[in-house]
Amino acid sequence: MNDDEDRAQLKARLWIRVEERLQQVLSSEDIKYTPRFINSLLELAYLQLGEMGSDLQAFARHAGRGVVNKSDLMLYLRKQPDLQERVTQE
């Protein structure tokens, strides 16, 4: 697979997860959404995950490692204690 195929496959999987989450969150509400809305959320999530990956790689490199580990994630989540707690519990 090339990068474009990988990206398309990742976005397809992310689309499914975004739509599933919307269904979970909005199941009790009378709110409708369009495929265009799902696509907007997908693109936002994709960009955010890309930025997160870059930050995690930078943290690992700064620590002299070539591999991202949990300490990098905890540093990334340093301003989000609720998420840090969830990561620590798992």
Swiss-Prot record:
Q: Which cysteines are joined by disulfide bonds?
A: none
Cellular component GO terms held in the UniProt record: FANCM-MHF complex
Superkingdom as given in the UniProt entry: Eukaryota
The record's GO molecular-function terms, alphabetically, read: chromatin binding; DNA binding; protein heterodimerization activity
Keyword annotations of the record? DNA damage, DNA repair, DNA-binding
Substituting residue 62 to A results in: Disrupts the heterotetrameric state and becomes hypersensitive to MMS
- Please verify whether the record's keywords include Hydrolase: no
Which processes are annotated in GO (biological process)?
A: DNA damage response; DNA repair; replication fork processing; resolution of meiotic recombination intermediates
Q: What is the residue range of the signal peptide feature?
A: none
Q: How does it assemble?
A: The MHF histone-fold complex is a heterotetramer of 2 MHF1-MHF2 heterodimers. Together with MPH1/FANCM, forms the FANCM-MHF complex. Component of the inner kinetochore constitutive centromere-associated network (CCAN) (also known as central kinetochore CTF19 complex in yeast), which is composed of at least AME1, CHL4, CNN1, CTF3, CTF19, IML3, MCM16, MCM21, MCM22, MHF1, MHF2, MIF2, NKP1, NKP2, OKP1 and WIP1.
- Family, similarity comment: Belongs to the TAF9 family. CENP-S/MHF1 subfamily.
Role description: dsDNA-binding component of a FANCM-MHF complex involved in DNA damage repair and genome maintenance. FANCM-MHF promotes gene conversion at blocked replication forks, probably by reversal of the stalled fork. Component of the kinetochore, a multiprotein complex that assembles on centromeric DNA and attaches chromosomes to spindle microtubules, mediating chromosome segregation and sister chromatid segregation during meiosis and mitosis. Component of the inner kinetochore constitutive centromere-associated network (CCAN), which serves as a structural platform for outer kinetochore assembly.
Q: What is this protein called?
A: Inner kinetochore subunit MHF1
Q: Which gene encodes it?
A: MHF1
